[in-house]
Structures are given as structure tokens and as C-alpha cells.
Amino acid sequence: MLSATPLYGNVHSWMNSERVRMCGASEDRKILVNDGDASKARLELREENPLNHNVVDASTAHRIDGLAALSMDRTGLIREGLRVPGNIVYSSLCGLGSEKGREAATSTLGGLGFSSERNPEMQFKPNTPETVEASAVSGKPPNGFSAIYKTPPGIQKSAVATAEALGLDRPASDKQSPLNINGASYLRLPWVNPYMEGATPAIYPFLDSPNKYSLNMYKALLPQQSYSLAQPLYSPVCTNGERFLYLPPPHYVGPHIPSSLASPMRLSTPSASPAIPPLVHCADKSLPWKMGVSPGNPVDSHAYPHIQNSKQPRVPSAKAVTSGLPGDTALLLPPSPRPSPRVHLPTQPAADTYSEFHKHYARISTSPSVALSKPYMTVSSEFPAARLSNGKYPKAPEGGEGAQPVPGHARKTAVQDRKDGSSPPLLEKQTVTKDVTDKPLDLSSKVVDVDASKADHMKKMAPTVLVHSRAGSGLVLSGSEIPKETLSPPGNGCAIYRSEIISTAPSSWVVPGPSPNEENNGKSMSLKNKALDWAIPQQRSSSCPRMGGTDAVITNVSGSVSSAGRPASASPAPNANADGTKTSRSSVETTPSVIQHVGQPPATPAKHSSSTSSKGAKASNPEPSFKANENGLPPSSIFLSPNEAFRSPPIPYPRSYLPYPAPEGIAVSPLSLHGKGPVYPHPVLLPNGSLFPGHLAPKPGLPYGLPTGRPEFVTYQDALGLGMVHPMLIPHTPIEITKEEKPERRSRSHERARYEDPTLRNRFSEILETSSTKLHPDVPTDKNLKPNPNWNQGKTVVKSDKLVYVDLLREEPDAKTDTNVSKPSFAAESVGQSAEPPKPSVEPALQQHRDFIALREELGRISDFHETYTFKQPVFTVSKDSVLAGTNKENLGLPVSTPFLEPPLGSDGPAVTFGKTQEDPKPFCVGSAPPSVDVTPTYTKDGADEAESNDGKVLKPKPSKLAKRIANSAGYVGDRFKCVTTELYADSSQLSREQRALQMEGLQEDSILCLPAAYCERAMMRFSELEMKEREGGHPATKDSEMCKFSPADWERLKGNQDKKPKSVTLEEAIAEQNESERCEYSVGNKHRDPFEAPEDKDLPVEKYFVERQPVSEPPADQVASDMPHSPTLRVDRKRKVSGDSSHTETTAEEVPEDPLLKAKRRRVSKDDWPEREMTNSSSNHLEDPHYSELTNLKVCIELTGLHPKKQRHLLHLRERWEQQVSAADGKPGRQSRKEVTQATQPEAIPQGTNITEEKPGRKRAEAKGNRSWSEESLKPSDNEQGLPVFSGSPPMKSLSSTSAGGKKQAQPSCAPASRPPAKQQKIKENQKTDVLCADEEEDCQAASLLQKYTDNSEKPSGKRLCKTKHLIPQESRRGLPLTGEYYVENADGKVTVRRFRKRPEPSSDYDLSPAKQEPKPFDRLQQLLPASQSTQLPCSSSPQETTQSRPMPPEARRLIVNKNAGETLLQRAARLGYEEVVLYCLENKICDVNHRDNAGYCALHEACARGWLNIVRHLLEYGADVNCSAQDGTRPLHDAVENDHLEIVRLLLSYGADPTLATYSGRTIMKMTHSELMEKFLTDYLNDLQGRNDDDASGTWDFYGSSVCEPDDESGYDVLANPPGPEDQDDDDDAYSDVFEFEFSETPLLPCYNIQVSVAQGPRNWLLLSDVLKKLKMSSRIFRCNFPNVEIVTIAEAEFYRQVSASLLFSCSKDLEAFNPESKELLDLVEFTNEIQTLLGSSVEWLHPSDLASDNYW
């Protein structure tokens, strides 16, 4: 109580006594919603409200509402700029955020065709739990999805509902029209054709949530309805929060395939349609993806009769469904010459391309010249070669069409998966059913769909998106389709949403990969490449290696390998597929590596990662890869002979029971979902449970090894809602993770080896060159495919890569192929490496673009999504922003073809502008090529050794890859998807397993299991699986060149081999390194570019890179965190990524600044990590901090997820070692620099989206000061300005104010709060003092253990110092800080000091401020750390941000001493002391709650009113201050104002509704408080006015000051006639009479006139009694009526007449009323008093004008 007295010392005694008396009574202080709560709310909103499109009826549900939901959530974003060529929309961009969407998607899937459409004879009832879960989650029954029932093939065909029947959103359908599908309702995927017929790939919904169209597309792709396939194999277990497609065991799968239901399953694309429609763009009539059911997807025939045909008859529907995939449709459709004009793929591609596709996918890296469509075709033929050739799509066009449907399907699957955690598998299942036409598709729709869809898609976009093809043939999306799909192969709707990581789960919806290929074939290579460019980045972003993006970026290749290499990791294939699509399409020759990866798992590793990446996406090869790996079954050809029943090998449903349609037994390679992680094709598609044929078997191990697939799932789940994916992830993770992880790790090693391999590098260079040229043409497509950049984020684009690392553990397989060599660090070993090496050159710019687009997306999504979510909204947004940035800039194409363009960037070294994309293909490919590649390629290699050797950067890349993969598996997977819920989900469920395994192995020694043991165990298991998979080397063999590069070495390094800092760091650290490596890559790329910054593009790329990465990392993580405890894990992983990369980057002077910023971004992204990292930073070396941060992030994520790896101690140790290594390598003041960088980066974690500032953390502190508003600036101008694209991505991330803020907050509460206990706060304070990133990291590590605790007291600062300075940090900033674990304090000069504080700042409104505040600091620091050139660039980038930056902190703010003990805030202090600027600063930046009350219950308004600060009172009221806020003693602000005699304030308060009648609890009223006569009189009059006066009150009488009668003439008087009362403004017609007086003259008495209302329709008028008129006229009534028929006569009751007349003020003759009886019921006749009657009565009327009166002086 006493402590509060000083606060009120200056107030009157009454205030002192009462306040002091009440001071300690009870803390009435209002605590803002925790960030975690907010994020949760947002996430929940996202999950629950998937944007309408998720909500569909049972049959409609089959259109993959989940995908729609994903799409919807990001619809705005998609429309904003993610629409790529041909109106392709990245479904990932679509809101994958709501659980409802997921639910809907799941339901849709269930209703769609998980019935025995394929196998009418087979009655399959999805597991009841799954069905129930779907219903429960979705809130709606699985809709015919509950059970597969025998249905005659014919019925099933007819059963396939049209888009409308399926409940396709008409909007989705409409969207298709933009695709120009020529009315084709379905997409026919040539490769899907045979498969569809045999395996019914058409019913294979790759991504339930991501792409409703993808399933439909696949179905549509099937020319004929696939054999009736029991579709209910996979029903969404959790329709809402977590959509899990139930993938029945292989025994179910078989029936699935046999069904001849090729009827295209149409998925209506509610909102997802924009994303999913890209796949849909296939004009094929049978476009099952439209329905959300791929051709191979079993669909209820009754539900999708239109799809049933798999023919064009349903084209309109499909088209409608495809609407969301406008551009994509074109891409997909071209391959199939079906009626749908979109099927541009030559007929030859169907068979020719199919074989070629297979071939290319098998050896895409080897045959760079292979056209995407061809490679996809090859894949198709590889899988469904027989199917395609002898399937329903024997002709290339059909194959093309089939391929197109697959992309749609894939998209849909990806989207739906993303939406549904588990729905994608469902959709895939459904799609499979549809595709069964040509090949019996196993009920595991994924596998089947992959077969048929993939074949077609391969034909269409041979190397394009085969990444998903493995898990789902549909993976092979054409480039444009991928962009539309966002991640065509991985989950057609996932390209944009890394969150679609969900598909990394066992579900085998990787099939979507072929989709891009499909369109590309038919359409044009350039278009496809365009799509691929965008798709590839996203593909890359997907865990899958960039299948399609191999050419453009090694990342793609690597990703491809990853997807092929590991079943689940093959999921990255989808991403790679998207990449690959673009790459293959634009430079088939370059892309072949990607395809090759899938096609030839073992060879691919040696081949460029791109091939592997493409391969992952490639339907045929990736399938075994990820299938086998995920299933643990040997990968077998996904495409079976047409006559061969497609039965996925026994799939351990336990694994995929929740997450994916594909059974766990089926190795579901991570498909490249939108932009995040790979999508896992449904195991159903392959007899062996693999999506790709046996020849791909070698590959699956590697791709599957990539944990990126898992993280992808996690990301998707993030988008969908953490809850949704968790179940899926958890069950899925055990097997899938193990398979995925191990192969991934192995892939990583391979990737690394490959990258390190000069030959590989050369090949990469070649591919990149080819890709570069092709991709450059693809740039336009990329621009169109803005969604794809999201998809590209992690994979194709540098930023994307980083993001991919974060988002795309699954995507890593894609990266692993070629470009993903650098990517493995992000996605997985292989993926990270493949993606990262190319990243340095191309990716810095590209990723910056993508980051910018992602950021912009994030911003848009934050606005739209957030809050969801928003997840929407978040990951998507980030990716989108990145893409948008790329689009805006010349480099748009670059991001789009990041896999390809990135090499160009890297080629020239650092400062390659986007325009230079072509120039740097080689460096990109090589990964350690030029200086730019030095930094970036280092990442590309991602091998610690290579990284170190190159730039110290390469050191990071490897750990970065693993870290990325781990991060992906742990939640890093979806940068964008992270925003969604997939990443978090993956983190906690699927990812948590990987992380659990990895961390248990690598971090077990020091692991701190702070969170629930279950989560810890899961995370560690996940880690272990990732680890083992990467080290496995089995299927990852192909990826191994890239993947194994990082895998064995990096994996162990990540695991705990701390020999090599990047790799020596524990798995966690490695992950962090990988994450950071991505960032570092950005950083390095930026730095290298900085010298070349002459073009702002380069700076922009850097910024974009950061932004995209950060947004991906942060928004997804935040959303994830808010959605689930796992969310923090994701965030942490991301951070760690940054951290690890940062360390590597530190090796290079330029690298360090960017890296730290990236790290900061990451940290901010996961505030959870921040505390932990902060703690670590203190004790750890600064250089080590990045790795440590990454590991810490991972740990924090794990902790949040329930797995708490060794925290501080381990991280510190790693950091120290890393510092030693890095400081030696960097030659910079490594440690201090790192600290500064880390500190700067941490504050910038959120603001990092801003320019290179984050990249240049050197001036974090100084910059924070001046650039507190960076976040806002970057949020606002970043999107628009190329210089700020990165920031734009970052601000959303950093401030999360618009998109990321909400998501971040949501995720943050669960992470950061728990990790910010007093100890952590103290550490934060230390960090604040030292500005040491290491300290921050250390704190983060500690925070990880305190995350939960911190979550609870997010608003309470733990340390005194923190409390002391807390008031200096905007609430939002604080909120963001907890996310990053930093406490940002703005100096008087506007500088934001980064202070680590465990306490989470006020959660809700402070978030926006936080980013703003935080940003400036990182910028400053970056300037300090970065070279002069970079520094110059920084300002360039930051100036736009500054434009948007919020009010800078006034100098007084730092001088004000806030009495925290009394519960006082800076706002209250400033209000008391009259610091208006500080008050405005606090209000505008939401630093304090305007209604925050201190311990005595007094708020800022009390203080200002008591002291008479009128302006401050006005500001407070304008910002929503409670005018009647009551202190604990009942004192209101009005009481304070009256007591202190502030009359104007009293007036103001009363005008705002202050209640003057309220008294204090002691009974004092305002009238008793007055001290002046003036105040008393005013209050008396006011109260009298309120209650009125008594009649006898003399004082109440009115005083009239004059009368024309009483006043002398000479005095001013009022002349009534001079200005008679009356309406002054009348119509022109009445103007003449306005001032006229009318006089009636008569020789006889005038008849009485009555003003009466006779009709309700008319007002009162003047009436005469008819009796009076007749008496005067002396005539009868009849004669009067006859003579004057025009005179109106009315009848009224006498009683009514009397009532009205007696009450009339105009009637004064009481005598006249004596004749009337007030109770009489007789009627009276009235005649209206008119001029005619007047004349009749002999009266004359004259008008007197006032002017005449004046002149004539009548008066």
C-alpha cells in the first residue's frame, strides 16, 4: 500500500489517503491477453474458420474443404499477388489456417470419395475413430467418407459429384474460369490416366485441405472413371483442428487401386480454390481434383457423378472447381489433349512423357534437357507407365490431363492436408478412387493418385513437381499449377503453405507433384516453368526437395532427392515438384536431376539435387522413396500396370492414421506442399505403400529421411490448427519420421556429398544454368504464381529456402536433389543442402523476394488471416510476401524459379540482382560456387565442413539442413505453413517424433524435458527418426549426395557431434544452424549482394530473404505456437535455424550480420526460443549463438512440444565451440559481433522482415533505437517497396502486427511465456546490457524450460531490471520480444534497445508496436555488423520501414522512472507527469494498456485528470480509455478532475459519457468535491439539465432578452413579419410563397375549419364539415357530389372527429364542439378545404408579401 503512495504524492489529500488505503487491496490491474492466448485465438479462428470454403456438406466435403480452407485463409493473399500464370493460385496461400477448413476438407474427402468408388465391390469403413475424429474436428460428419461402400462402378462414376454436387465452392469453380480451362471441368493428368484407370489416381486426394481441386483434378484426369475403388480408405480422422486422412492398411489400398472409378473427384475449392485450382487448371472434364478427389482418389460416386467420368463432361464443374487454379489449370490441362483445352500437354506426353517423366524423374538430374512435361511424363510412365500407356489415359493428352488433375489433386491434397492435418490423405484417397479408372488405385488414395496423376503430371511437367508424385502421383504439378497450387506436387494446395507439411505425415499425398508437369506439358514450357518457378520455390519450401525446381535451384534437386530418398521426406517432392515443375518446365535439362532423384533414388544423390528434388515430386520415383521409407516398406513403383491392382504395401495405419490419407505403413514421401514441406503421397497409390514405382525405391529412403516432410505436415497442421495435425503427426511420426528422418539425414549427407562433389556442383551449375535460362522465362510465371513463392520460400528461393528449411523439413527432399543441397539445412539434410547451396547466389535475392512476398503475404495474411491464420494466417503470408516481392521486382521470376534462379544469383556472388538470376545458375547449382554462392552455396552444401570451408557459411548449411529438417520435422517445416498450424503440429506430433528422436539422440544428453513428457518424447522421437533417416542413406541414396552430405556428418553433428560447430552442434544446434544457415544464406547472400547493392534488388533480396525466412519461421511458428505447444517448437526450430546459420554466417564478415538478423528473426519468430537462446547467449559464444539459437529454437520448440532437449548447457557448449570455429573463420569480432548480431537479430526476430537490418545485426541496438518502427514500416512499405520486401516479410514476422503478429503471439504465449521466468528475464537483462546474441540464445535455451511458466506470466516481467524498463517497450514489442525472448526498449532517440526479458509484454495490442520497436534496433545493429556497403544498403532497406515505423520513443520515455512495485506503467507515469509525447508513444505503439490500473486501481486517465493534462486526457479517451474507470476506492477520473478543479477536463469527460451521478465508495459525489463556485455552478446546471427543474423553480424560468412589442423601435428588436417563422429552405416552387401571408376575405362568416388527420397515409389537413358547406351552398349532398365530383369527401367517426378537434391546437372555438358527441358512433362527412371550395363559398384569398408590407407600410 505504501509503495503506491509516492505515485500520488502530488494529488490532494483525499487522493493520497484513499489511494494509499486502497493501494494494496487487490490488484485490479488488467492483464492483456497473452500472446499465446491471442495466437491461440487466432489459430483457433483459423482452424475453426477455414474461410468458408472449408465448410462443405458431406459430399461437398469431398472437394477437400480442408484444402479449400487452406486456400481460403490465404485467399486474399493469393489474390493479392500469389496468382501466378494462368491465374494459378497457391493453395498454400489459401487460408490453411482454420481447423474448420481442415475439418471441411477432411469431411469433404470423406464424403467425396473415400467410398468404394474405385472398388465398388469393396466396402471399406475408415477407422471409426478417424471418421469420428473427422466429424468431431470438422464438426461435420465425414460425409460418405465414413465408410467405403460397395458401389457399382457406374454408380460410382456417376456418384462422383460435380463441382456443385461435391459442394465445390462456386467461387472455386469460378476461379477455374480464370484458368481458361475451356470449360474443362477436370484436369486430366496423362500420367494419372493409366493410373487412374488402373489405380484410380484420380481419386487420390493428395492434400485434403490444400487443394480441393487437386483431388478433383486427379479424378478428372482419369479419362474414365477409375475402377470403383473403395475410397473410404482414408477418412479425415480430425476434420477440424487436425485433418487426418485415414489411410487404410495396404490391404485397403489394394481395393482402392483396383476400382476402375476414374471418375474425377472434384473438390470444390471454397477458398482453397485459388490455391487448389492451379492444379485444377487442367481443362480435363474429369478433374477429380476439383472435387477434392484426385482421379485416383476414391470418391463417393454419388457425390461426384461429374467426376465419375473422369471426362470432360464434367469440365464445367471441374472448371468451377479449378477456378482456384486458374493458371494451374492451364498448366495441368495442357498435357492432356482431352476436350479440356487446358490439356496442352501433347498426347505424346501421356505415354511418351510418362516414360520420359519417369525417366527424368529417375534421371532428371542427368538429363537437364528433359522437358518438365516430359520428365513428369517419364515419372508417370515410370510409375504408371503401364498405367498411362495401357490405362485410361493411354494417350499423352489424357496422360497430360491426368497429370493435370493430379496437380490439382496434389494441390488439393496439400491444401486439404494442410487444412485438415489428415484430410489430404483423404482427398488423395478419393482422388485415387477416381484415378482408379486406368489403374486400380489402392484405397490409399495417395498412392493411387500418384500413380495415375503422377504419370500424367509427369508427362505434363516431367521434372516439375514430381516431388509429391511419390506420395501422390498428383505431385507432378506443372510449374504454373504448382504456383497455383502453391505446392502442386506436395499437396497441391500446399505450395504456398509450408504448413501443408501435414502432408509430410504418412499420408501419401505427394502425388500432387505431377500436377505442375501436367500443365506444363500441354501449356508451354515457359508457362510451366513460370509456374514451376513459383511452384519450385514453394516446392522447395515444402519439405520435399524441389522436384521441379532442380534446374532453377539445386535446392529443388536436393528436395527431389529427398522426396525420392525418403517416403515421408519425399513429401518434399511436392515442393520439389512445384520447383521441379518450374525447373523442369523451364529447363528440363536442368531439372532432370530433380526428376531423376525420384526416378532413380540411388543415382539421384550423385545427380544434381534438383533431379532428386524433382524426383521427390516425381510421381514414379519419389513414391517408393517416400512410401517405402515412411512405411518402412521397400519403395515400389507407384504406378502399377493398368491391370495391376494398386495396393499400397501394408501401411501401418497407426502412423498415418491421423495425419494423412495414406496409411502409416505406406511410406509417404513428403510432398511439396504449397511452399512449405513435402507432401506425402498417399501410400494407397503404391502397392508397396510407396507412391513411386520400385525403381524409385532406392530414392525413398533418402527423401523420406528428410524430416522436412514431417515438419511440412506440422506446418500444414499449423495452418490447419495445431490440434489437427498433432494426431496425425504423432501416429505418423513414429514410422514416417523414422523413415523420413533417417533417409533425410542420409539424404542430407548425400546432398552434402553431392554438393561437395565437384561433379555435382558442376551439374548443379549446369542444371541451374539451364534452369536459369528456363526459369528466367519462368519468372513471369513466378510473378503470377505468387503463391508459389510461398511455396518457393523454403525451397526454391533463397528466402524460401530458409523458410523452406524452417518450413520444409519435408521439402528438404526436394532441395536435396540439387538445389536443395543448400536446402537440406532448411528442410532436411538433403533438402537443406540442395536448397541452400544454390540459395547463396540466387536465393539471397530470390529468397529475399520470396521473403518479401512471404512477408507481404504474411502481412496480408496477418491482416486477413489473423489471425489466421490466420496462419492464416502467417506462413502463407510470409511466403506470399516473398513471392510478391519477387514478383514486384525483376527477381520475381527469380523467387519463382528460385531453384533455378537462385543459382544465377549465387553465380555472380553475393550481389546478384534478381535480374541476374540467369547469370548465377552455376553458383546456385554448385552451392559453394561464387562468393555469393560462397555464403549461400555454403548453405547449399550445408555441410559443416564445406560450409566452413566456403564461407564458414557452409559450416552452417549442413547443420542448417539437418536443423532445417529437424526444424521442419519439429515445426520448422513450414515457414508459411508454420503460420498455419502444420509446422507446430509436426513439431508436436509428427515433428515431435522426429525431433524427439533427433533430440533424444543428439540432445538427449543435455535435453531438458520441460514440457510434457509426451511431447518431449515425440519431439525426440521425431528427431531420432529424422536423424536415422538421414543417416540411413537407404532411399536417401539418391539424395544422399546432397542429403548425406549433411546427413551422416551433419546429422551427427546436429545430434551432438559438436566437433564441427555447424554439424558438431547437437541435432538441435544443427537444426538451428540449418535454420540459421538458411538465414545466413540470406544473410551471406545479402551481404555479398550488399557490395553489389547498387541495385536495390540485391538489398531487397537480402531483406526478402530475411523476411521470407523470418516470416515463414516466425509467423508459422507463432501461429503454431499459439495453436499448439508444438508451435513454439516450430518457432524454436526456425530460430535455431537462424542461429546455426548465423554462426556459419559469422564465419564470413558479411555473413554474420545477416545471419544474426536472420537468427533474430527466427528468435523473434519463436519467442520461446528467444528466452532459451537469450540464456544461452549470455554464457555462450556469440558466434555459437546462431547455432545455439537454432538448437535452442528447436529445443524450445521441442520443449513447447513437450520435448526439451538439453538447453542452455548443451547450447552453450555448442555455441562456445561454434564461436571458436566461426570466430576463426570469420575473422570478425565473431563473438561480440555474433552477440550483437544475435542481440540485434533477436530484437529483430520479428522486425527482421525489414531490410538487411536483420541481416546486419551489428547495430541491432542502435538500430533498434532509431528504427523501432521498422516493423510497421516494413509491414506497410515493405510489400510495396522492393528495397523493403524482406522487411515486409519480416515486419509481419517480426511485428506480427498484421499477420505474423497475431500468429506469432498465438504461438508465442505457449513458448515464450514458459521460457521467460525470472532467471530468463535476468538473462535477458544481461543480454540487454551486453547486446550479446549468445546471451540471448542462452536465455532462449533457459527460456525453453521456462516456456510454460513464461506463458502463464507473459505480462509479468521476471526481473526487476526488466520491470524497470518494461514500460519502455511497446506492449506489442514486448509481446514480440517474448516471442523472440528479447526485451526491446526504445531509447529517447528512438533507438530500441533489445532487452531480453522473460516477461511477455502485454499481449494484444503491443504486438504491433513490438515489431516496430524491435525493427529499428536490428537495423542499426546490422549496419554496425555489416560492411559499409551493406550498411548503406541497410539504410536503403530500412528507410521504407522507417516510413511505416510508429511514433519513435521520445527521449523522456527512457528517463521516466516507473514505479513497477505500485503496478504503474510508463503510460500512467507519463500521464501523471504530463509527457504527452510519451503518452502518444505508448498509445500508438500500444506499449501499455490504456486502461491499465495500478495497485490502487488508478489508470492513466485518473492521473491525467487529477493533474489537469487536458490533451493527454483527450488522447487517452480517443484511444479508448474507460471514462468511468473506477479505482479501488471508487474514484473515477471525473472525481479527480472535479476535485482538482479542472473544468475543461470535466466538460470533456462529460462529453465522453462520464457519469456525474457516480459517487466514490465512501459516498462522495462530484458536488461534494467541488472547490470553486464556477465548478459548482457548472455541475449544478449540468445536473439540472439532466433531470429538469420544478415548475415553481424561479431559477428554472427562461429569460427572454427582448420582444418586438416591448423593445423600442430604435433598439434591435424582432419583427415577426420581417422574418416570419417557417421553413427557410423550401423547394424552388415554394420559394415564392415562403414569405407570403395568405388572407381569406368573405362577406359572410367563415365556416369553421378543422385540422384533422383522416388517413394514416396522410398528415393532418384542413377539412370543412360537409353539412356546413351544403348549408351555405343550399344544396343537397347528392347534387353537391354530382356537381363537384372532384372534391374529396371523406367519412370519419364523430367520436374520432371530436377527439382530434378537441386536441388540436389550431381549433379554439370550444363552442363549436358543443354540438358534437364525443361518444357518438355516427359518421361525419368532411370536405377538404381547397381553393375551389373557398371560391364556391364566396371567399377571396389574398397574399401579402413582407416586402410589400415594408413598402406600403400597411402596419
Curated annotation (Swiss-Prot):
Pfam families with a match to the protein in the record: Ank_2, BCOR, PUFD
Effect on the protein of changing W509A: Abolishes interaction with BCL6 and inhibits BCL6 corepression activity
Residue ranges, annotated region (Disordered): 309-345, 388-438, 557-641, 737-760, 773-794, 815-844, 1071-1187, 1220-1328, 1430-1451
Modified sites of kind N6-acetyllysine: K392
Taxonomy, superkingdom: Eukaryota
The species this protein was found in: Homo sapiens (Human)
Ranges that cross the membrane: none
Function: Transcriptional corepressor. May specifically inhibit gene expression when recruited to promoter regions by sequence-specific DNA-binding proteins such as BCL6 and MLLT3. This repression may be mediated at least in part by histone deacetylase activities which can associate with this corepressor. Involved in the repression of TFAP2A; impairs binding of BCL6 and KDM2B to TFAP2A promoter regions.
BP GO terms, sorted: blastocyst hatching; chromatin remodeling; heart development; negative regulation of bone mineralization; negative regulation of DNA-templated transcription; negative regulation of tooth mineralization; negative regulation of transcription by RNA polymerase II; odontogenesis
Assembly description: Interacts with BCL6; the interaction is direct. Forms ternary complexes with BCL6 and SMRT/NCOR2 on selected target genes promoters; potently repress expression. Can interact with HDAC1, HDAC3 and HDAC5. Interacts with PCGF1; the interaction is direct. Interacts with KDM2B. Component of an approximately 800 kDa repressive BCOR complex at least composed of BCOR, RYBP, PCGF1, RING1, RNF2/RING2, KDM2B and SKP1. Interacts with CPNE4 (via VWFA domain). Isoform 1 may interact with MLLT3/AF9.
Compositional bias segments (type: Basic and acidic residues): 775-785, 1076-1107, 1166-1175, 1253-1279
Name this protein carries in UniProt: BCL-6 corepressor
Entry similarity comment: Belongs to the BCOR family.
UniProt-annotated stretches for the region Interaction with BCL6: 498-514
Tissue: Ubiquitously expressed.
SUPFAM superfamilies referenced in this protein's UniProt entry, alphabetically: Ankyrin repeat
